[in-house]
């Protein structure tokens, strides 16, 4: 257990990264839940395909506990191979690919990466770096992560200038992908 003051989600994730001793990492937001078999299924998909990352689908859960699988842009059971195929998922404009919490990662992907402190949309600042480190990504179509949507959450709150962090993350992602030879259409979505 790590005891530290509230420094936000990035600080908590970074503390976990710094203290991690195993070979695999996962991030679960404190107000969300997971299927009891999520980690075992992600591990099996990752290890059987020798992938650097595995990912599952998610379901939205409202404040009354009702689960909505209809609004989710589902992924299919597949193993993505090659950076171009993996990074293509960012071009699809699917929010699903930029969140950290539906995935199991090999720790080596975060060897030099940390989440930016004081930013909203912190996942979006690092996901392209993570995906650039992957040669294979194993995908599971089942919704094993339950994303709790609160009306007073950061993503559900009224506009503020801090919401521009998402635009900054997208710009940095576009620049990084362009620097790594991705065509402009891939970089700007």
Mark where each language-model region is:
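C-terminal, non-catalytic tails of nucleotide-sugar-dependent glycosyltransferases
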Residues: 81, 168-188
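Nucleotide-sugar donor-binding/catalytic module of glycosyltransferases
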Residues: 1-168
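Short, conserved alpha-helical segments within structured domains
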Residues: 122-123, 187-189
């Amino acid at each position: 257990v790590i005891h530290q003051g509230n420094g936000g989600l990035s600080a908590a994730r970074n503390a976990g990264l710094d203290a991690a001793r195993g070979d695999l990492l996962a991030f679960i937001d404190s107000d969300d839940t997971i299927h009891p078999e999520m980690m075992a299924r992600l591990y099996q998909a990752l290890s059987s395909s020798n992938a650097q990352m595995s990912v599952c689908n998610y379901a939205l859960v409202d404040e009354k506990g009702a689960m909505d699988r209809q609004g989710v842009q589902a992924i299919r059971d597949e193993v993505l191979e090659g950076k171009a195929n993996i990074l293509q998922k960012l071009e699809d404009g699917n929010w699903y690919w930029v969140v950290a919490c539906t995935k199991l990662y090999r720790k080596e992907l975060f060897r030099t990466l940390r989440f930016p402190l004081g930013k909203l949309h912190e996942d979006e600042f690092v996901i392209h770096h993570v995906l650039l480190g992957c040669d294979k990504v194993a995908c599971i179509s089942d919704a094993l992560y339950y994303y709790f949507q609160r009306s007073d959450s950061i993503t559900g709150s009224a506009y503020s200038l801090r919401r521009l962090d998402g635009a900054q993350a997208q710009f940095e992602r576009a620049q990084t992908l362009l620097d790594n030879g991705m065509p402009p259409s891939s970089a700007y979505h």
